[in-house]
Amino acid sequence: ANQKMAGLQTRDQAKTFIYAFLYGAGPSKIGKVVGGNARVGQQLTSKFLSNMPKLKTLRDNVTEAAETGTIKALDGRRLHIRSPHASLNTLLQGAGAIVCKQWLVHMDERIRKAGVDVKLVASVHDEYQFEVAKKDVERFGQITKDAMIETTSTLGMRCPLDCEYKAGTTWKETH
């Protein structure tokens, strides 16, 4: 959908554009990542935002709010803004971190209650790796899903979140 909204030819171009846009890249950088110049970058950004008016409103509101030096995060805390162009990224990255931390809290509560044999071995961005006894894999998988639903509710989110789990003996099998 983002590829179509931006009018880009390939999924790779769209993915690179989206990340550059969300990280606050300006027209020159956006033009460069899609094989063009600043004019192309400006046209692409304008087209994308005209096709996604709510995103434009969010970006404009967050950029304006960032002029105070902070913005309000998903859980109410204040996030410090280093630069207005990075304000949307700060909000989104902050939300992701808050969701993942709350999700881990809810998983821990449920794991203790269920008596599941599990150890956290890695936390990478929005992914957790656990060592789980074979007998508990399916039950633990359901705990992770239920904890994410509870996280959505705890944080008062209007958009439901979901997650998936994979079982394997190596990180490669579970990633």
Regions found by a protein language model. Name each.
Residues 1-175:
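Conserved catalytic core of nucleotide polymerization and phosphodiester-bond processing enzymes
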